[in-house]
A protein has these predicted regions:
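Alpha-helical transmembrane bundles and membrane-interface segments of multipass inner-membrane proteins
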Residues: 1-135
Length: 135
């Protein structure tokens, strides 16, 4: 939260880190790619409720897991979802600050919580694909 307060207080232009990576400050009132970003209070609280509800369900799923990979992957998803939900509660929007752009294409800004969710989902998919099926 200190980092977000710092970035928000700067009112800065994007900070160039590399030729393809900047630090920016974007307030996302929706979800991925700004979907459901109407900015209305009802949407904010519905998204927050949904994130917590899904997280609770995933915690129950974690408790049933025996594989470390699945536990870590689900933990990343839960951590990311809760992190973004806390942003919504505290700030009214999710603070996104990583900007990646390559060959004229710019990916929508994202944050550490988004990265955790993405890595967690990738690990879950890989685990499902690489685990031998038992008969």
């Amino acid at each position: 939260m200190v980092f977000i307060e710092f970035l928000n207080g700067l009112n800065f232009e994007p900070i160039r880190i590399t030729s393809f990576f900047n630090i920016v400050m974007v307030w996302n009132r929706g979800v991925s790619f700004g979907l459901f970003g109407s900015g209305e209070e009802l949407t904010r609280w519905l998204l927050t409720f949904f994130a917590f509800a899904v997280s609770i369900g995933l915690v129950f799923w974690i408790r049933m897991q025996t594989k470390t990979t699945a536990v870590v992957a689900l933990g990343l998803v839960v951590g990311g979802a809760v992190g973004n939900a806390v942003d919504r509660i505290v700030y009214g929007a999710v603070a996104d600050f990583f900007d990646v752009h390559v060959a004229g294409y710019s990916w929508p800004a994202f944050n550490i919580a988004d990265s955790a969710i993405t890595v967690g989902v990738i690990l879950l998919v890989l685990d499902a694909l690489l685990t031998p099926k038992s008969d």
